[in-house]
Curated annotation (Swiss-Prot):
EC number, as in UniProt: 2.8.1.12
SUPFAM superfamilies linked: Molybdopterin synthase subunit MoaE (SSF54690)
EC class name: transferase
Pathway(s) it belongs to: Cofactor biosynthesis; molybdopterin biosynthesis
Lineage summary: Bacteria, Bacillati, Bacillota, Bacilli, Bacillales
Catalytic activity from the UniProt record: 2 [molybdopterin-synthase sulfur-carrier protein]-C-terminal-Gly-aminoethanethioate + cyclic pyranopterin phosphate + H2O = molybdopterin + 2 [molybdopterin-synthase sulfur-carrier protein]-C-terminal Gly-Gly + 2 H(+)
Any one GO BP annotation for this protein: Mo-molybdopterin cofactor biosynthetic process
Organism: Halalkalibacterium halodurans (strain ATCC BAA-125 / DSM 18197 / FERM 7344 / JCM 9153 / C-125) (Bacillus halodurans)
Any one GO MF annotation of this record: molybdopterin synthase activity
Pfam families for the chain: MoaE (PF02391)
Top-rank taxon: Bacteria
Protein name (Swiss-Prot/TrEMBL): Molybdopterin synthase catalytic subunit
Binding sites annotated in the UniProt record for substrate: T36, V37, R38, T46, H102, R103, K118, K125, K126, E127
Gene: moaE
Length: 156
């Protein structure tokens, strides 16, 4: 497991190690969001997911989300790790840990983080079902790539 607070990795995520990165004496709450691979999506039985990303770009966007959270909730500490590669049903795909002095901010910041991940982080998934497969171009599932994963763009 990496010690980076914002990481993309191929190996299974060790949840406690993500949490440990936000432990702080001023924290009265640590909220942890754990996103897993579910079996049914839109009525189709999922066999597994294949996540791909441009790790350096994705980690920059995760860090950007961390900065946005810091601006909105100045006392928050955030760590986010997203897994790539083949993930089976029930595997952990993403872990978000947020610590704040009070629980309400922790919940809000955690929700903000997952929504922003789905909006701006360049991670794609290929859904494999019993009757086919499809690349999903963004995690909001508004863009698909029937010809395969998107080509790498220039880094910002």
């Amino acid at each position: 497991m990496t010690s980076k607070r914002f990481a993309i990795m191929e190996q299974p995520i060790v949840i406690q190690q993500v949490i440990d990165q936000v432990v702080h004496p001023h924290a009265g709450a640590i909220n942890t969001f754990i996103g897993t691979v579910r079996e049914l999506t839109k009525g189709k039985r999922t066999l597994y997911l294949q996540y791909e990303a441009y790790p350096s770009m994705a980690e920059k966007k995760l860090a950007q989300i961390g900065q946005e959270i810091q601006e909105r909730w100045p006392e928050a500490r955030v760590a986010i790790t997203h897994r790539i590669g083949r993930l089976e049903i029930t595997d952990v795909a993403v872990v978000i840990a947020v610590s704040t002095p009070h629980r309400a901010d922790s919940y809000e910041a955690s929700r903000y983080a997952i929504e922003r991940i789905k909006e701006i982080v360049p991670i794609w998934k290929k859904e494999h079902w019993e009757d086919g497969e499809m690349w999903v171009g963004d995690q909001l599932e508004t863009t698909s790539y029937p010809e395969g994963a998107p080509k790498m763009e220039e880094e910002e």
